[in-house]
Amino acid sequence: VDGVELRPYQHEALAALLRSYREGKRRVLVSLPTGTGKTVVFAHFPLAFKMKKKLLMLAHREELLTQAEQKFRAINPSLKIAIEQADKHASPDAQVVIASVPTIGRSGSARLQALTPDAFSIIVVDEAHHAVAQSYRTIFDHFGLFAPDTTKLLVGFTATPKRADKLGLGEVFQDVSFARDLRQMIAEHYLAPVTGWRVESGTSLDGVKTRGGDFIESQLARVVDTEARNELVVRAFQTLAPSRRGIVFCVNVEHAQAMQRAFAEAGVRAAAVWGDMSKSDRQAVLADFSSGALQVVTNCNLLTEGFDEPRVDCVVMARPTKSKLLYTQMVGRGTRLHADKENLLV
């Protein structure tokens, strides 16, 4: 459709969703690894479901909203598509509304009330492992998605169907309609093969306590953000990945900045990005990284979702984690295929 060809597994995902709906399931998940085109799948919903009513797409970050908007427009050029976020207001006649959860998910939100429940038939959640949060529940309840007789369909997309805080997604979603894992996608040559090196730092994590299924960040930072360990990370990168483009995942902002300094002191072109950084500064760094002016970007939790740079062929886990969700997301930043890429080094 309009130059966006569906891959076989994307066709299968759409067919599986239609089947689930006919079987009476109304809240379902699709699990696809990062980089396998989940946006393309949900952007085909208006066609696949022969949609008569509107579609609402929910995401919690601006990058995800913009990516979704581009795909919806490319695949559905005749539909009116609008974003509802901050100072952008969706026009009432938009057939696809792409909405920011922080904008409409506050209880009593006038902007949520303005979206008439009966006008919508499909609700899509990107990065659905967030869907157990209260802001999402507020939105789901507004649309009556838990009513036993609802005809609306809620579809969540995730690369990792387990949520870190053990709540699980079972209280929101009834079933996983379609799933493919990283191994299958690599075997079918849709993602780059992954190879790994373990570098022993001698750092003991014995004293670091766990909360919500992962290490407590402040305690973890004290142990791993040391000059000696940071320099070891840089040396390992220079030895194992001298010509690769790397993303380095750190514990917190201070660690990301310290890691950046360690790379720079060793002569590696590196910059740090973090959540509170101004949007223009962040975009400038990522543009330099894309162009090759920078070889390494250090960050904490910022590039785990919605960051697409297919040339990344090295992911450095400078932060230990117990979370399968976080680990999968971090690896997923480097698994996209690119002509110049032989494999991903973790």
Regions found by a protein language model. Name each.
Residues H129-G196:
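Post-DEXD/H (motif II) to motif III coupling segment of the RecA-like Helicase ATP-binding lobe
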Residues V176-I247:
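Conserved interdomain linker/interface between the two RecA-like ATPase lobes of SF2 helicase motors
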